[in-house]
UniProtKB/Swiss-Prot annotation:
<feature type="active site" description="Charge relay system">
    <location>
        <position position="382"/>
    </location>
</feature>
<feature type="signal peptide">
    <location>
        <begin position="1"/>
        <end position="28"/>
    </location>
</feature>
<dbReference type="GO" id="GO:0005576">
    <property type="term" value="C:extracellular region"/>
</dbReference>
<comment type="similarity">
    <text>Belongs to the AB hydrolase superfamily. AB hydrolase 4 family.</text>
</comment>
<feature type="modified residue" description="Phosphoserine">
    <location>
        <position position="425"/>
    </location>
</feature>
<feature type="active site" description="Charge relay system">
    <location>
        <position position="351"/>
    </location>
</feature>
<dbReference type="InterPro" id="IPR029058">
    <property type="entry name" value="AB_hydrolase_fold"/>
</dbReference>
<comment type="subunit">
    <text>Interacts with PDE3B; this interaction regulates PDE3B's stability and expression and, thereby, impacts the antilipolytic action of insulin.</text>
</comment>
<keyword id="KW-0964">Secreted</keyword>
<dbReference type="InterPro" id="IPR012020">
    <property type="entry name" value="ABHD4"/>
</dbReference>
<dbReference type="GO" id="GO:0060612">
    <property type="term" value="P:adipose tissue development"/>
</dbReference>
<keyword id="KW-0597">Phosphoprotein</keyword>
<comment type="function">
    <text>May regulate adipocyte lipolysis and liver lipid accumulation.</text>
</comment>
<dbReference type="GO" id="GO:0016042">
    <property type="term" value="P:lipid catabolic process"/>
</dbReference>
<keyword id="KW-0732">Signal</keyword>
<protein>
    <recommendedName>
        <fullName>Protein ABHD15</fullName>
    </recommendedName>
</protein>
<dbReference type="InterPro" id="IPR050960">
    <property type="entry name" value="AB_hydrolase_4_sf"/>
</dbReference>
Length: 459
């Protein structure tokens, strides 16, 4: 797909948005700006249901989480963060401008990438883009004396590589990380070699990719960041793997958490049309390959994101399933209680794609699960959180600072466990050994039987 085609689609949606007044809120919420501001004043924050266990942060942001030692560590790091300090309001403050700048503006030259194609167990292909440059002169070291951590970045579910994703990779590279971008089957130049695409919340391909990354960097900490609708994939992976996950910490930028309701209610018209057109353009090159699997005529006539998703994954010719069954298998929160990795979700109260937090964010998840943390801001749009150039998006700064805090917290925990083990050994008790990693890395011979990979260099 030509890179200008998706940008043109979203640009047309942006123009339509400027002409369309009023538009409906996502997930069925219709509230005026005035009512929303009155609610904020009355509740002291963006959403009334999040008033419990709310910790104030700079810039009018809040951290909602279950009290714990880890929460206190993260809270201290966020309160020291310069990225959250309030800045003068600019023309970028509006939620739609934040969102459109993120999705529409050209990505620019971007980083230098080394692409690997990973052949999966069913012979499908996914792509891993390793960020190899440019290396800044003043590159910081995140963990002195240890291997550089790997940062796995998962773009949105539509497959569009945005300027913010590339900006995060460049900032992470500058801070001493080794970033790698995961691309699904058929996304961003990854060939679709089998007539099977990845469902919205199916983490099977991501599992194999993470195992391969672990094979390549067995001793390096692994962190993961997802953008927008791509968060469903990351959360599904963390839930299915539980304590066996190789990931040390994760973050989700503007995640879609109530996915089924999000599809069924629909987005504001310009966003719905823009994302739908982008998907149709992306899959049009594979129309002939998909003819034996789905009704491509109906697929490309779809008038909504729900109809497109349902036609592509539910109304298949070989094994059709119901819409209810599809979400039983793909709801990203279906196994959320099994997740054993700290997850920071950064959301905005003015998100025009997800909708207001009181309708789209499950407050009980952050109140009851000690691994989930919600950073809620008043402004930022959808995956925007932009600041005046040349400053990076403040969400990127916050994510990397939170990962640093997690690393220090876990290092201290391991140190305390080590002291306890030595004391037990000195007293003659039974010695117990604990490892930094939850699972042993599979022998290379076994992995080589599963995976085949190719590498090509791109700029």
């Amino acid at each position: 797909m030509p890179p200008w085609a998706a940008a043109l689609a979203l640009l047309l949606a942006a123009l339509a948005l400027l002409l369309l007044r009023p538009w409906k809120r996502a997930v069925g919420a219709r509230t005026s700006v005035r009512d929303h501001e009155e609610q904020e004043v009355a509740s002291g924050g963006p959403a009334d249901q999040f008033s419990d266990r709310r910790e104030a942060l700079p810039g009018g942001c809040s951290l909602i989480c279950k009290p714990s030692a880890l929460a206190q560590c993260l809270l201290r790091a966020l309160r020291r963060s310069a990225a959250l300090e309030p800045s003068p309001r600019s023309w970028l403050s509006g939620p739609h401008l934040q969102t459109f700048c993120h999705f529409i503006l050209p990505v620019g030259p971007g980083p230098e990438l080394a692409r690997e194609y990973l052949q999966l167990a069913d012979d499908g292909l996914v792509a891993l883009d390793w960020v190899i440059g440019p290396c800044a002169r003043g590159r910081r070291v995140t963990n002195p004396g240890s291997l550089p951590p790997v940062l796995l970045v998962i773009p949105n579910a539509w497959g569009r590589l945005t300027r913010n994703v590339l900006g995060l990779c460049l900032l992470a590279l500058e801070r001493g990380y080794y970033p790698v971008i995961f691309h699904r089957r058929g996304h961003h130049g990854c060939p679709l070699v089998s007539p099977r695409l990845q469902p919205f919340g199916d983490p099977s391909d991501l599992k194999e990719a993470v195992t391969y990354i672990r094979f390549r960097h067995p001793a390096a900490p692994l962190f993961a960041v997802s953008e927008g609708s791509g968060s469903a994939l990351l959360l599904s992976y963390l839930g299915e793997c539980g304590s066996s996950s190789y990931v040390t910490g994760a973050a989700c930028i503007s995640p879609v958490l109530r996915c089924r309701e999000w599809f069924e209610a629909g987005l504001p018209w310009p966003y719905e049309r823009g994302f739908l057109l982008h998907q149709k353009i992306s899959l049009s090159r594979y129309a002939s390959a998909l003819e034996d699997t789905v009704d491509t005529g109906k697929l490309f006539r779809s008038g909504s994101l729900r109809e497109f998703e349902e036609t592509l994954f539910c109304h298949t010719k070989s094994c059709p399933i119901s819409w209810d069954t599809y979400w039983d298998l793909n709801d990203p929160l279906r196994d959320v209680d099994e997740a054993a990795v700290p997850v920071l979700c950064i959301c905005s109260a003015d998100d025009p794609v997800c909708g207001p937090p009181e309708h789209t964010l499950p407050a009980e998840l952050f109140h009851s699960n000690p691994y989930f943390f919600l950073l809620l801001s008043h402004h930022g749009g959808h995956c925007g959180f932009l600041r005046p150039e040349p400053l990076p998006a403040w969400s990127h700064e916050v994510i990397l600072e939170s990962f640093r805090a997690l690393t220090e917290f876990f290092r201290m925990e391991e140190r305390m466990k080590g002291l306890s083990r030595r004391r037990t050994s000195f007293l003659g008790g039974r010695r117990r050994w604990g490892g930094l990693q939850k699972r042993e890395v599979s022998p290379s011979s076994n992995l080589e039987e599963i995976f085949n990979w190719k590498r090509s260099y791109t700029r």
